[in-house]
């Protein structure tokens, strides 16, 4: 496990949860995750769940992605996807407001790996350098990803070679990410 990435993710999650406590006097709340089972669910009100992060309970790797494409995934990405179960969290990095994707449950972890595999298959078909997404942007065509060759965090336009480097590492990116509610 890449401890720097795991610690940076836990620290951002703590900042995010603290922002909810300070600004809304509650745990993080999600309507999108209502009705979806997770060890993170603390309470349900109306059609929303209140959640808090929980320790990841499965093998701490995304080896299914590696096996499917016969590649080696950078260690920070293994750590990112297997540090915790949590709801997706919004944040800001420089001028980008994004939704940091998280694994909500054991079942969700399988879906996340399938989506990563699909993303990598499309990139391979288009002869693009492999990336694994970690966040979405409002545009829908752009995502925040980690380049599997360099380890850099990039903003990429899906299906194209358009990429902008945002941070030299995933740990650095997470350390500079600010919560947005």
UniProtKB/Swiss-Prot annotation:
Keyword Cell inner membrane attributed: yes
Location, primary (coarse class): membrane
Subcellular location as annotated: Cell inner membrane
Keyword field: Cell inner membrane, Cell membrane, Membrane
Pfam families: Syd
UniProt xrefs under InterPro entries: Syd, Syd_sf
Function per UniProt: Interacts with the SecY protein in vivo. May bind preferentially to an uncomplexed state of SecY, thus functioning either as a chelating agent for excess SecY in the cell or as a regulatory factor that negatively controls the translocase function.
UniProt family annotation: Belongs to the Syd family.
UniProt xrefs under NCBIfam families: PRK04968.1 (NF003439)
Protein name: Protein Syd
Gene: syd
């Amino acid at each position: 496990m890449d401890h720097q990435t795991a610690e940076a993710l836990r620290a951002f999650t703590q900042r995010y949860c603290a922002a909810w406590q300070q600004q809304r006097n509650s745990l993080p709340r999600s309507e999108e995750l209502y009705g979806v089972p997770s060890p993170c669910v603390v309470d349900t009100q109306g059609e929303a769940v209140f959640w808090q992060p929980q320790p990841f309970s499965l093998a701490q790797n995304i080896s299914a992605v590696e096996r499917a494409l016969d590649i080696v995934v950078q260690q920070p990405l293994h750590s990112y996807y297997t540090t915790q179960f949590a709801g997706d969290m919004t944040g800001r990095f420089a001028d980008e407001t994004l939704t940091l994707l998280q694994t909500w449950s054991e079942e969700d972890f399988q879906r996340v790996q399938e989506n990563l595999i699909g993303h990598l298959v499309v990139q391979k078909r288009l002869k693009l350098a492999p990336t694994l997404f970690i966040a979405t942007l409002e545009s829908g065509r752009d995502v925040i990803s980690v380049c599997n060759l360099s380890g850099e965090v990039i903003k990429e336009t899906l299906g194209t070679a358009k990429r902008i480097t945002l941070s030299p590492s995933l740990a650095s990116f997470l350390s500079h990410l600010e919560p947005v509610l």
